[in-house]
Amino acid sequence: MIEIDGSFGEGGGQILRTSLTLSVITGKPFRIFNIRANRPNPGLQRQHLWAVKAMKMISNAETKGDEVGSKELIFVPHEIKGNTNIDIDVGTAGSVTLIIQTVLPAIINKNVRIRIKGGTDVPKSPTIDYIRLVYLEILRKIGIEAKLNLIKRGHYPEGGGEVIIENVNGNPSAFSLLELGKLTIIKGISHVSSLPAHIAERQMNSAREILSKLGVPIEIETDVRQGEVSKGSGIALAAIGEKSIIGADSLGERGKRAEIVGEEAARILINNLNTKASVDIHMSDMLMIFASLYGGEYIGAELTSHAYTNMEIIKKFLDIKIDVSGKRPFRFKAKIF
């Protein structure tokens, strides 16, 4: 059984999520201890527990310690269940997108349909529009297709969002994403839930004003939803090049003007573009697991503590070589084979 110290590196939920994904894919059981030991609320929290439950349902796993507050978990996966529907409710505003990142690599070509309820647009995780505009589009470039249906949005603290992910199929193989290529267009989605529509327009216009200096077409749509459980706003942007995509997002909050939200996302996007990387900071971390499974190389915008931690966890499950050139917190090249 693979032994994992949950306090290693950045010591957060990413260690658990990466372990769960690779355990289900490889069939290798693991024991993780000191779960989130250095965090203010150590042990498994509800959204981490739902990642465990989701992967348990997918793989008919045996578990011990899967309860809120637990600092140790044993996870023994069995064969992945195909042709099945799974419902996951991470509660209030638990991150839907972190659950997507955990389960998606494990359900490729398994005909699994997953309904996830919780927070679609919440702090400290990619927004659902980033997942749609950037994450899924880059996966398409490496041979993985997935259908994502956003039924309801959920913001902090009430949540209430709902997403269905299905038809995750493909024939992924080793990939090379070493440049963005010529920038062709910037796409985006500016949204509001149960707030005035002009907020989405102001976010969009603010971002557009800053991005206009890039000299490419800009297509930002607005998504205005009334009657949602939670109130909130945000914007996600995708700079689409001939070979890759760079993304950014920003969320509204009480006291934060709509113009600031749009400006923030635009400046984050430009900062990522200025690194001359092939993928942004979010994707630098998220792409590593796919490169580890299929072989790949890419240039990430920033070598984060998440990335370092991921490397060590991945090597516990897979017999691979990870060659990384670059220093924190700057851009880096990852080659995994």
Curated annotation (Swiss-Prot):
Record-listed ATP binding positions: 101, 282-285
Q: Return the Pfam families for the record.
A: RTC, RTC_insert
Which Gene Ontology cellular component annotation is one that this UniProt entry carries? cytoplasm
Tell whether Metal-binding is among the UniProt keywords: no
At the top level of its lineage, which domain of life is listed? Archaea
Q: Which reaction does it catalyse?
A: a 3'-end 3'-phospho-ribonucleotide-RNA + ATP = a 3'-end 2',3'-cyclophospho-ribonucleotide-RNA + AMP + diphosphate
Per UniProt, the keywords (alphabetical) are:
ATP-binding, Cytoplasm, Ligase, Nucleotide-binding
SUPFAM superfamilies associated with the record: EPT/RTPC-like
- Classify the main location: cytoplasm
The active site of this protein is located at 306 (tele-amp-histidine intermediate)
Q: What class of enzyme is it?
A: ligase
Task: Give the enzyme's EC designation.
Answer: 6.5.1.4
**GO annotations under biological process?**
RNA processing
Compartments reported by the entry: Cytoplasm
InterPro entries recorded for this chain?
Answer: RNA3'-term_phos_cycl_insert, RNA3'_phos_cyclase_dom, RNA3'_phos_cyclase_dom_sf, RNA3'_term_phos_cyc, RNA3'_term_phos_cyc_type_1, RNA3'_term_phos_cycl-like_CS, RNA3'P_cycl/enolpyr_Trfase_a/b, RPTC_insert
- What is a single molecular function from GO for this protein? RNA-3'-phosphate cyclase activity
Function, as annotated: Catalyzes the conversion of 3'-phosphate to a 2',3'-cyclic phosphodiester at the end of RNA. The mechanism of action of the enzyme occurs in 3 steps: (A) adenylation of the enzyme by ATP; (B) transfer of adenylate to an RNA-N3'P to produce RNA-N3'PP5'A; (C) and attack of the adjacent 2'-hydroxyl on the 3'-phosphorus in the diester linkage to produce the cyclic end product. The biological role of this enzyme is unknown but it is likely to function in some aspects of cellular RNA processing.
* Family membership: Belongs to the RNA 3'-terminal cyclase family. Type 1 subfamily.
Q: What is this protein called?
A: RNA 3'-terminal phosphate cyclase
The species this protein was found in:
Saccharolobus islandicus (strain L.S.2.15 / Lassen #1) (Sulfolobus islandicus)
